Amino acid sequence: MCTMPATRDASGSGDASTDLIAARSLSSHQGQRSNLRIFKLLISCCLLMLCIYPNAWPWSIGPGSGPFSVSADSIKGRGDTHRLGEMGTSLSSSLPSSWLTQSNNHANISELLDNLLRGYDNSIRPDFGGPPATIEVDIMVRSMGPISEVDMTYSMDCYFRQSWVDKRLAFEGAQDTLALSVSMLARIWKPDTYFYNGKQSYLHTITTPNKFVRIYQNGRVLYSSRLTIKAGCPMNLADFPMDIQKCPLKFGSFGYTTSDVIYRWNKERPPVAIAEDMKLSQFDLVDCPAGNLTDIVYKAAAPRPQRRPFNNKDPPRPTSKVMTTFAGPAAKNQHVRGTGLKLDKGAFGTGRDATGGSGSTTGLSGTITLETNHPSEYSMLMVNFHLQRHMGNFLIQVYGPCCLLVVLSWVSFWLNREATADRVSLGITTVLTMTFLGLEARTDLPKVSYPTALDFFVFLSFGFIFATILQFAVVHYYTKYGSGECYFIIEELDSESGESETEPLTSDFRGSTESKIYEVIPLSMCAISMPPPPTRLGMLTSRNRRPRNRRHGLWSMKLLGLFDWRRRRKPPRADSDEDEDDEQTQLRANEAPTTSAAAAAAQAAAQAARISPPTGGRRRMSYYRREEMEARRKGKRTPQYNSVSKIDRASRIVFPLLFILINVFYWYGYLSRSSRILANTPDAST
């Protein structure tokens, strides 16, 4: 009973040991298989590297030769070396040839750039210690604007290309050029180009920095970038808006002198190219000449305080010694870089003080000595953009309205000289409108100290309008009667007049206690038309009229005769000594029967003869005096009126002719001047 379990245990332990041995053999066999797989993977990687870089391996794969020949024992009977070579050959043949060639080119370029930049110092210019490096520049202008007269600036978008030769970057290979990325740009030398008159210029960085570098086999480097340049443009607005502005662009090296770097325009391409689709809203780009300049800079030494003599109480006069000789016509921009000093050309080469040698100067604490033995010269390039302004906008907004206002002011010459209110209001309205128009025209201009061509035209128009008001003042000064109304003289009636005659006068004419009264009646009421010839019924009716109505009818006829004399200018009547009363004559004419045409004609002739004044001076005066005396005696109203002013008649011709003549001289002078400027456009270096 007790041994059986022991026997079973022994047999059980024997089975366990057998299983353990089998498990160990299985695990070792699996380990060998995994090692074999790893070894195969390494061999495959080596073959792949050999296919990718065949030139880097001096040996080739062949059956039973080469470093990749493996013995049969090492691969546990899985094949021989000939089979391994066939596997490598099949892998290399399965890859595309174009991909392999491109991979080889990339590898060659990377290796070439590494070799070129190995030991390259980008802080040293090309040919250091030898001749100066030549920088060739050309510009491609894509767009221009805005151009501001107030700030005197202009902006443009351009491709700024620079080219120079750096022999350290020369190479040999199948490719003629190498295009470098932006990251490689920081590893090579570049000129420190800056814009002399630049303001807020920047490089475009969307979507990536817009610049690239290209290297040629001979070591030439082409560096191109897209810039938006905002530069200053000193404008002369004397001919505005018929002006031609010259906006310069100056650039050069900031730190390298002419002994290190020289700037030149590219001879293979035009210095400044303009895009064909470029348009400006207010200007036309007529020309863009380019030239070379040399910027001569004089370095200023530090101020040295002067010692005061012990026995001299007066402080010494501070001086500034200037001894300089110009070196050719190219040396035009002479200044002290980094300071506010302005060199006096009159003191150059004379050895005298820059202050003129007389008088004392306050505000200087010492002397400033200019080191003129070795002035620094900087190479500089400049291009002038000649911009001709469009005049269409100003013709519509300024010139046209000014001319219309001047013509409108001439309407007062055709108004009556008595229409004071109308002529004055018209003149003041045109003056105020002209003032507003002149102020509005200068809103887009800087506050310059000199008048422009537009200001001259505005002043001219304002002067003509103001002269119109002065002309009316002179006309009004010589106006004898009225200021828009018709005046009549009324006197008290004689005491001998009857009540029937005084009653209508006092009721109609608003009599007063004064001996003479001036009553004002509008001109519209002074226009009285000729009544038709009286009929038989009318004559019968007129007999029954009251004396007041008859008197009003006689007054109307008399007033009509005075106005018709001015209009028709009929000859005077032959009998100037006729003293018959108008009322009696009219009554007789009304009472006489008009049965025949001869009687009617005789009556009309007599009436015309009575109302026509004489033309002679003496007869005219006697006629006026007689009419006035008759009016005073009978209480009638005598109208007083003025003739058309001779000044108005002359102004209708003189003012338009003078305005046209001045305009001809104005436009001819300014337009011909602009044409001469275009014809005699100087070079950019002047």
Curated annotation (Swiss-Prot):
This is Gamma-aminobutyric acid receptor alpha-like. One of its GO terms (biological process) is chloride transmembrane transport. GO terms for cellular component: chloride channel complex; membrane; plasma membrane; postsynaptic membrane. PROSITE patterns: NEUROTR_ION_CHANNEL. Glycans are attached at N108, N292. It is found in: Postsynaptic cell membrane; Cell membrane. Residues 97-393 are extracellular. It comes from Drosophila melanogaster. Its main location: membrane. GO terms for molecular function: extracellularly glycine-gated ion channel activity; GABA-A receptor activity; GABA-gated chloride ion channel activity; glycine-gated chloride ion channel activity; ligand-gated monoatomic ion channel activity; monoatomic cation channel activity. Residues 570-641 are annotated as: Disordered. The chain crosses the membrane at residues 394-414, 424-441, 456-476, 651-671. Residues 597-609 have a biased composition (Low complexity). GABA, an inhibitory neurotransmitter, mediates neuronal inhibition by binding to the GABA receptor and opening an integral chloride channel. May combine with the ligand-gated ion channel subunit Lcch3 to form cation-selective GABA-gated ion channels. It holds the Pfam family Neur_chan_memb. Disulfide bonds join C233-C247. It comes from the Eukaryota.
